[in-house]
């Protein structure tokens, strides 16, 4: 019996010594370090997905989806994407162009004749070079009833009525424009004969199996989505997180809840990764069309402005082409960054008014991916 126990003990020792616990992947350990620091020092609250060479290596959730109830975020949590939505608007235009229903250099008055401007093209709208002013300021100037939710047709009507001067001649400068992308959504609706939400669902979300993605207007629809990540703002005076609807400085979240094209796509990190993968294929549009979307446009003087169709464009000497977009709306700060040549991807969705946390995570994860790529 003693001999048996001795032999068993030796066998156990040999087994445990020959099969040590697998060390954590250095990249995952590095990402964990970034995220732990962001949570501890910057109050990061949200979901993160990191892909390496086209495969997900990290997907985690941090914090509550609802600070009132204490419900926690998970992989299926749905976030308002804010301006990350613009890439979907651009894709809708690209699809209609491939169908022969419009051209990038068409004058926008061909589709929205109410606009009081000449020389603005769809390409100008796609690349933020049209010179059109912002609708938010125009609505406020007109004395819009804050208890009334505006929609895209309201924006068109206000511009037709007020005829505000352009900020600059089309193509002369680059200036980010939410109005341009709202107008693009109106063009999609008028050309396709479908609502903007229907078009995105039928042509993008369903074909890509993005089951948790849709146009969603929290206040206008009255519908409550399961697993919804409610956007909260930390009130310094109250020392707690509150919904923006409860804070007087953010009353416009109600007024502008009906505007489509510049925001209001809602999605998950997992669905956005499906979107990321599809952009490498010709499932939605041809690869030639995608290449044009990922190429910086230029101004009238031929200088590049660093924006394609719905994406900021960056060329890194170590990692190649990077396309990205951030999204900001009261209670949300988001980022999607695609390393086109390597297949790496960073998706950061947050449901708190905390741009420093998003920026910290995005910049650090980019640095870690680039560093790892350089030492392969």
Task: Please give the residue ranges for each predicted region.
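Short, glycine/proline-biased beta-turn/loop segments that scaffold the active-site neighborhood
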Residues: 104-118, 206-208
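Short, gly/Ser/Thr-rich active-site loops of penicillin-recognizing serine hydrolases
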Residues: 352-376
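Active-site SXXK
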Residues: 35, 48, 54, 78-106, ...
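Short, surface-exposed loop or secondary-structure junction motifs
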Residues: 119-326
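Short, well-ordered beta-strand elements
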Residues: 324, 335-352
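Bacterial Sec-dependent N-terminal signal peptides
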Residues: 1-26
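Short, conserved catalytic-motif segment at the N-terminal edge
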Residues: 24-79, 101-106, 163-164
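A short acidic/small-residue loop/turn micro-motif
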Residues: 63-67, 256, 353-355
């Amino acid at each position: 019996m003693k001999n048996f126990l001795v032999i068993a003990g030796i066998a156990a020792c040999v087994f445990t010594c020959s099969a040590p616990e697998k060390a954590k992947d250095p990249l995952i350990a590095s990402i964990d370090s970034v995220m732990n620091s962001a949570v501890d020092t910057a109050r990061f609250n949200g979901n993160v997905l990191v892909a390496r060479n086209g495969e997900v290596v990290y997907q985690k959730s941090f914090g509550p989806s609802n600070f009132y109830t204490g419900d926690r975020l998970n992989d299926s949590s749905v976030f308002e994407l804010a301006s990350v939505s613009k890439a979907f608007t651009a894709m809708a235009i690209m699809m209609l162009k491939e169908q022969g229903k419009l051209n990038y250099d068409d004058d926008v008055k061909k589709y929205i004749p109410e606009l009081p401007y000449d020389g603005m093209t769809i390409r100008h709208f796609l690349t933020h070079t049209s010179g059109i002013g912002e609708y938010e300021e125009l609505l406020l100037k007109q004395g819009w009833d804050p208890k009334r939710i505006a929609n895209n047709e309201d924006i068109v009507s206000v511009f037709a009525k007020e005829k505000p001067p352009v900020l600059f001649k089309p193509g002369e400068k680059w200036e980010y424009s939410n109005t341009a992308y709202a107008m693009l959504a109106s063009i999609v609706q008028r050309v396709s004969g479908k609502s903007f939400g229907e078009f995105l669902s039928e042509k993008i979300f369903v074909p890509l199996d993005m089951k948790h993605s849709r146009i969603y207007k929290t206040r206008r629809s009255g519908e409550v989505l399961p697993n919804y990540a409610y956007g909260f703002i930390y009130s310094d005076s109250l020392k707690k997180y509150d919904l923006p609807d409860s804070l007087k400085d953010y009353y416009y979240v109600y007024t502008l809840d009906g505007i489509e094209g510049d925001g209001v796509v809602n999605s998950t990190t997992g669905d956005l990764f499906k979107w990321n993968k599809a952009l490498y294929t010709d499932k939605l549009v041809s690869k030639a069309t995608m290449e044009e979307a990922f190429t910086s446009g230029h101004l009238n003087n031929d200088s590049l402005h660093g924006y394609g169709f719905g994406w900021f464009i960056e060329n890194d000497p170590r990692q190649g082409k990077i396309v990205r977009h951030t999204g900001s709306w009261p209670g949300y700060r988001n980022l999607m960054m695609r390393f086109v040549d390597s297949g790496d991807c960073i998706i950061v969705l947050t449901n708190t008014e905390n741009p420093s946390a998003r920026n910290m995570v995005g910049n650090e994860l980019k640095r870690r991916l680039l560093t790892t790529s350089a030492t392969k």
